[in-house]
């Protein structure tokens, strides 16, 4: 196959995207596919540029707002539609996280170009990126979610409606960027201001003590449940992308009944958002085994430490085969019209 990997982008998760792309490119080339790499900020990468950007580490903190502004100034001026390598591809593999690349904008452009691409369509991508809208759809589909408010919200309303502590996070952001665990009313405003650096809409969410679990979906089949035990109190940016900062177990050592319920909820959430190809759905499970769905990821990470490839491996799917399967799913799906 002729595969073009789209990566980078002007988002807080740019480094994560490159780390995912590095693994995907190596896996597909190991199967003798013709692979090119395009940074959606700067365009087609030559061999030297590719080696440079795909060899870096994610780091322990996301980029600053100033760095994001600089990336936006470097945004690709030539339309993706005019890149011959894009139009000549059998499939586009989206190694993108956050921003236009994951939130539906790029998907809408690719629908016009007419080249198959991995993951979900424009509408599903936009819904998954918006935590407020996606949680409303989960709840309507019968998937339990933590209670939440959208900022602004008064501390007394937080105490009454959610209780302390709470999670404050940007509504449309991933990798725990801009996320804070707030224990006291006097710390709420600072947490909201931090989250607002990354998105105009901020969610204040009930904190669920307990276990962190995740379920991948491939095609229309749930993968084995995984459990994450981070070294920090939360599964934050550093815990997600620094080797040794969290312990992941696939399959999770949980009761069969609980695992099946999590898989059922993951598939329901996947369908509620009309996600396609693959996704990962994250949960918290209370000490009483009450399940709460946090979010669905339409383009889960494919880095060395990412959860989705570990889930696939637990199902007997090696990483190169996983990448090929995702490409095949993309090539076999009907032309997108913003509804898949």
Please give the residue ranges for each predicted region.
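Phosphate-binding site of ATP-dependent enzymes
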Residues: 183-264, 285-292
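A glycine- and small-aliphatic-rich helix-loop capping segment at beta-alpha/alpha-beta transitions
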Residues: 108-117, 184, 189, 314-315
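ATP-binding N-terminal substructure of ATP-dependent carboxylate-amine bond-forming enzymes
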Residues: 1-123, 127-129, 133, 140, ...
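Hydrophobic beta-strand scaffold residues
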Residues: 35, 116-117, 145, 166, ...
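Active-site nucleotide/adenylate-binding loops and adjacent lid/helix of ATP-dependent enzymes
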Residues: 3-7, 19, 83-87, 125-211
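ATP-dependent carboxylate activation and anion-phosphoryl transfer catalytic cores
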Residues: 1, 8-10, 137-139, 257-340
């Amino acid at each position: 196959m002729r595969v073009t990997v789209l990566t980078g982008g002007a988002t807080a998760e740019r480094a994560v995207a490159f780390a995912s792309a590095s693994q995907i490119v190596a896996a597909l080339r190991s199967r003798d596919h013709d692979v090119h790499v395009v940074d959606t900020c700067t365009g087609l990468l030559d061999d030297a540029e590719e080696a440079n950007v795909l060899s870096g580490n994610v780091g322990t903190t996301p980029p600053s707002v100033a760095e994001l502004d600089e990336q936006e100034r470097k945004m690709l001026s030539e339309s993706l539609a005019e890149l011959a390598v894009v139009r000549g591809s059998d499939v586009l593999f989206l190694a993108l996280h956050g921003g236009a690349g994951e939130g539906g904008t790029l998907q809408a452009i690719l629908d016009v170009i007419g080249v198959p691409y991995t993951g979900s369509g424009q509408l599903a991508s936009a819904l998954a990126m918006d935590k407020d809208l996606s949680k409303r759809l989960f709840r309507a589909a019968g998937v339990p979610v933590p209670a939440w408010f959208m900022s602004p919200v008064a501390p007394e309303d937080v105490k009454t409606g959610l209780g302390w502590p709470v999670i404050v996070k940007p509504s449309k952001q991933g990798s725990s960027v801009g996320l804070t665990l707030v224990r006291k009313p006097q710390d709420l405003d600072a947490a909201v201001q931090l989250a607002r650096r990354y998105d105009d809409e901020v969610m204040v969410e009930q904190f669920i003590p307990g276990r962190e679990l995740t379920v991948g979906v491939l095609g229309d089949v749930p993968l084995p449940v995984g459990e994450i035990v981070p070294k920090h109190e939360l599964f934050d940016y550093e815990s997600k992308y620094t080797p040794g900062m969290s312990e992941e177990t696939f399959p999770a050592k949980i009761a069969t009944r609980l695992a099946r319920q999590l898989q059922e909820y993951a598939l329901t959430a996947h369908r509620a958002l009309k996600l396609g190809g693959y996704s990962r759905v994250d949960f918290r499970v209370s000490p009483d085994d009450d399940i709460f769905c946090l979010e669905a990821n339409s383009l889960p990470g494919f880095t060395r430490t990412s959860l989705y490839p570990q889930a696939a491996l637990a199902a007997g799917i090696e990483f190169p085969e996983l990448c090929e399967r995702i490409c095949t799913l993309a090539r076999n799906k009907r032309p997108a019209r913003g509804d898949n």
